């Protein structure tokens, strides 16, 4: 427990307390749990009792397929090695040539994934383009309880589920392309999906854009270095 005292005239007290409470409520590591007021010699003294809670924060990166999320997340994890823990998602999607089990994803078949859903093994899961994606509860909740900041790269449905479950711990960040034409170009450049799949991804992107208002930060990935620097600034501001 920590106690903070503010002693001021009535006129200044309201503004002081308002600013302090706003600052406290913006940081999950500090929770206002009680207060009392003492009136003495025409001054008002307010004593705030604060409980320190060292839970980690959950940084959720999402955005349409092909926007560059994975490359940005890897760069952020490399830069913030001591401050971020990456939670590896599970998926039923087919493994790409460049991907490795247990590093990029935990690859599951449909029956295995659905059994994990029945066991309540995920903090979030969603079906995206006919494939399941989910974040395993075991590693995620252990990191949060230990005070470790968690980085998730997940689909927008999952992002909203995490926000609903951990409203005071979550920072939602949406990565968007500069244009649909550029997104199409990037999807084709990957050269690992047919035209039908690419078309579905573009349609899905339009649906995702409708959810942007649910995200605290929206970052346009036009130039990688500029986007990365913007994300670094966002994370640094949230760490403080």
Swiss-Prot record:
It catalyses: GMP + ATP = GDP + ADP. Its EC number is 2.7.4.8. One of its GO terms (cellular component) is cytosol. Keywords: ATP-binding, Cytoplasm, Kinase, Nucleotide-binding, Transferase. It comes from Mycoplasma genitalium (strain ATCC 33530 / DSM 19775 / NCTC 10195 / G37) (Mycoplasmoides genitalium). ATP binds at residues 63-70. Its main location: cytoplasm. It is found in: Cytoplasm. Gene3D superfamilies: Guanylate Kinase phosphate binding domain, P-loop containing nucleotide triphosphate hydrolases. Signal peptide: none annotated. This is Guanylate kinase. Belongs to the guanylate kinase family. CDD domains: GMPK. PROSITE patterns: GUANYLATE_KINASE_1, GUANYLATE_KINASE_2. It holds the Pfam family Guanylate_kin. One of its GO terms (molecular function) is guanylate kinase activity. Residues 56-236 form the Guanylate kinase-like domain. InterPro entries: ClpA/B, GK/Ca_channel_bsu, Guanylate_kin-like_dom, Guanylate_kinase, Guanylate_kinase_CS, P-loop_NTPase. Essential for recycling GMP and indirectly, cGMP.
């Amino acid at each position: 427990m920590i106690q903070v005292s503010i002693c001021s005239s009535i006129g200044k007290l309201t503004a002081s307390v308002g600013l302090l409470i706003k600052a406290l409520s913006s940081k999950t590591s500090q929770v206002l749990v009680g207060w009392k007021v003492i009136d003495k010699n025409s001054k008002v003294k307010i004593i705030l009792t604060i409980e320190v809670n060292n839970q980690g924060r959950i940084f959720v990166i999402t955005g349409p397929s092909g926007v560059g999320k994975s490359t940005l997340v890897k760069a952020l994890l490399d830069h913030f090695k001591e401050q971020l823990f990456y939670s590896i998602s599970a998926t039923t999607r087919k493994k790409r040539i460049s991907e490795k089990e247990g590093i990029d994803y935990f690859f599951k078949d449909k029956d295995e994934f659905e059994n994990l859903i029945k066991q309540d093994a995920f903090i979030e899961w969603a079906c995206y383009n006919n494939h399941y994606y989910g974040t395993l509860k075991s590693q995620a909740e252990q990191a949060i309880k230990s005070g470790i900041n968690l980085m998730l790269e997940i689909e927008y449905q999952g992002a909203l589920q995490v926000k609903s479950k951990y409203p005071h711990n979550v920072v939602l960040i949406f990565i968007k392309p500069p244009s649909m034409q550029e997104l199409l170009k990037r999807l084709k450049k990957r050269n690992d999906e047919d035209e039908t799949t690419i078309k579905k991804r573009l349609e899905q992107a339009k649906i995702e854009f409708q959810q942007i208002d649910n995200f605290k930060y929206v970052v346009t990935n036009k130039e990688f270095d500029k986007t990365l620097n913007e994300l670094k600034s966002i994370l640094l501001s949230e760490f403080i």
